[in-house]
């Protein structure tokens, strides 16, 4: 058996425990916890998935995360994923969750935020490349590079949440050299 998750309904109530692969194949709702990682200057961590992974190989993402395990909360899963994927232990702040219809399967997405004050040490089996981008640079990158399918919708929701809770994020005009895909 693979990774076990809780199958949930349209209100995010648990219906039972299933294999995540089966939940995806049958398009059953389950939970995913993600974190937007920011540095003290407000830049956002962007990473490229390795070419060998089964879902979205070689594509970029601005969120770190994964499935919420059986009996696990969204925040606990977000913290676990930060440690597994980036080798960091940082407090996460739950921002919101929403029902994401998803390209490969629908799921409840819990979005968190963390400010990382320590260097990241990505697991190469999870992260092939990473860089810190301003929100404006990230928006440009989403148009120029191939991001995981649900990234843009999540980013739009995140930006709306940030604008609604604290006003607009600072705008920066300088863009770094465009990250290149490895061959």
Stretch-by-stretch model annotation:
Residues 19-21, 58-60, 70, 96-99, ...:
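Nudix hydrolase/Nudix homology domain
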Residues 27, 31, 51, 73-75, ...:
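Active-site segment of metal-dependent pyrophosphate-handling enzymes
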Residues 10, 49, 135:
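Residues immediately flanking
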Residues 59, 63-64, 70, 75, ...:
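Glycine-rich adenosyl-nucleotide cofactor-binding module
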Residues 32-62, 66:
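A glycine-rich, hydrophobic loop/mini-helix early in the fold
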Residues 1-34, 40:
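Acidic, metal-coordinating catalytic segment for phosphate/diphosphate chemistry
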